[in-house]
């Protein structure tokens, strides 16, 4: 077995990896960095590994086994831009509160706004200030991920869509929720109350 195949075999069970991981594995075989870079280029060309962002990859084998697992996609979204959490339309769909089919995985981050278009999906990150980077939690499973509560997911969606609820009152917000076809009444009562508490400082009565 050639060194490139040996390295691929060692990487195939990782949910993601970066160049540093590959270099560390290659040290045991005394491979030079230039040689490893050639292996990476060749593996990308042969589609044995899939680029996620600059210097970050997943093996095609691992992705094929997990591509239908939503938790894996959310896990990768958290990894690509940290700190971040799943929110907005993506979280609302996760909670079965949105009727629209969502093609982009949307997250909220403390870093600058950014989009990653990858072969495993498109990831969109919206930047928010520290004081609003709240009300999300960790979902544990085979792939752990951070996601907004239902109330915060709706807050984040409308916060960015309306530019911080500019000029809106509570009735305007209710109408907008209806127009967006969000199943607000299906949301837990405590979450609905929490949402109205969240928007109180931004909207008029």
Question: Where do the language-model regions lie?
Answer:
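Short beta-edge/loop segments at beta->alpha junctions of small alpha/beta modules
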Residues: 1-81, 119, 134
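Short aromatic/basic micro-patch
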Residues: 16, 85, 148
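Hydrophobic/aromatic-lined pockets within catalytic cores
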Residues: 27, 96, 159-163
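Short, surface-exposed acidic
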Residues: 33-35, 100-103, 168
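Short gly/ser-rich loop at a beta-strand->alpha-helix junction or flexible surface loop bordering the NTP-binding
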Residues: 51-61, 73-119, 125-129
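Hydrophobic alpha-helical interaction segments
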Residues: 134-205
